[in-house]
Amino acid sequence: MEILSAEFVVSNTKVEKCPQDNLPEYAFIGRSNVGKSSLINMLAKRPKLAMTSSTPGKTLLINHFLINKEWYLVDLPGYGYASRGKKQVEKIQQIIEDYILEREQMTNLFVLIDCRLEPQKIDLEFMEWLGENGVPFSIIFTKADKLTNGKVKDNVNKYLKKLTEQWEELPPHFVSSSEKKTGRQEILDYIDSINRSLKA
């Protein structure tokens, strides 16, 4: 699949205010500073589609982008911002949970993981929560350009091994670099395969 058009549609904090046209939605989420906005811009080939910032946690809304007039790419608020007050953290968490659990159009959730880091408790707990709630998700390991290919492979394998402690069957996973465009086609082809299966 190639992206021919990508346009911003709406930002909000309420699931009921999301688009009502029943197109499939692919949501992206991750911890602070995982490279989510850069990944979204890389996938869409639009450098400024999603707002990037050196300040973690700028995405505080559910952002819908219409892709090829066929499906939505959804940029969700991130989780795990230690610098935020308790009330704001709880508010963001509620926005995330409401969308993930109530949005029937969400076809797949991409969980972004910084491949440079050891498995983080907050990510593992979040994925466990997704599993408990039957949420279909995939993993995208980001920032692969920051390490050698061998180190990326080692870190990803270590992460997947950690997941096997909780999971009998591992979710699909991808390795990406927004700088080098690594993983772009694989992720888009995966989305395309799901879209095709929905039409079958």
UniProtKB/Swiss-Prot annotation:
Cofactor(s) required for function per UniProt: Mg(2+)
SUPFAM superfamilies (UniProt xref): P-loop containing nucleoside triphosphate hydrolases (SSF52540)
Disulfide links within the chain: none
GO biological process, one term: division septum assembly
GO molecular function, one term: GTP binding
Domain of life: Bacteria
Keywords: Cell cycle, Cell division, GTP-binding, Magnesium, Metal-binding, Nucleotide-binding, Septation
Sequence ranges assigned to domain EngB-type G in this UniProt record: 22-197
Residues annotated to bind GTP: 30-37, 57-61, 75-78, 142-145, 173-178
Residues binding Mg(2+), per UniProt: S37, T59
Pfam families to which the protein is assigned, alphabetical: MMR_HSR1
CDD domains reported in the protein's UniProt record: YihA_EngB
PANTHER family: ENGB-TYPE G DOMAIN-CONTAINING PROTEIN, MSS1/TRME-RELATED GTP-BINDING PROTEIN
Function in brief: Necessary for normal cell division and for the maintenance of normal septation.
Family: Belongs to the TRAFAC class TrmE-Era-EngA-EngB-Septin-like GTPase superfamily. EngB GTPase family.
Protein name in UniProt: Probable GTP-binding protein EngB
